Amino acid sequence: MTAHFLRQHLDAELTATRAVLDTAQHAPLGWTPHPASFSLGRLAMHVAVIPSWTEAFTRGGSYDMGAGGSGPAVPVSGAEILATHEAAVTRAHAALDGLADPVLEEGWTLMRDGVPLATMTRAEAISRYVVRHMVHHRGQLTVYLRLCDLPVPALYGDSADRRLLPPERPA
């Protein structure tokens, strides 16, 4: 996988993610579908910050999750979610810009409290823990939006609320 391909792949998903976060900023941030679930605001912040993790995968040979905080921040406003996401995107782009392709094939290890959990190439780590992880939680967030009776953006095709393409015209 090349750095150029990875950047294009990430950017395509970031565009869709921004559309979901644009809607989420107007949602009741404290709402939760279940007591065991994140609040909508906390889930949106998690989605917003994930792109910044690209830095951890392009620097050093490992990352220890046990050294982190207590999970996503609780936002005070929708504007904070969008600002966090914009900063995360900037950090992701900076981490990937100028990155040599061979660096992406180097080994990288995810750990928790010093215990290795998974070892893979940097490219696979970014694909799995940034891109696919963001897409997974973005999908959860679209369900939250639907349950709050907010419009779900068209992402890969039309949604029940938004058309991705204009309607076809009769010939």
Label every model-predicted segment.
Residues 2, 6-10, 77, 81, ...:
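Residue-level preference for long, well-ordered alpha-helices that form the structural scaffold
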Residues 104-106:
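Active-site-proximal loop and beta-strand segments within enzyme catalytic domains
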Residues 7-22, 26-71, 110-171:
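Short, contiguous alpha-helical
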Residues 1-4, 40-49, 93-100:
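Short, mixed-charge, low-aromatic patches
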Residues 56-57, 61-101:
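Helix-adjacent hinge/juxtasegments
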Residues 94, 98-102, 143, 147-150:
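Alpha-helix capping at helix-to-loop junctions
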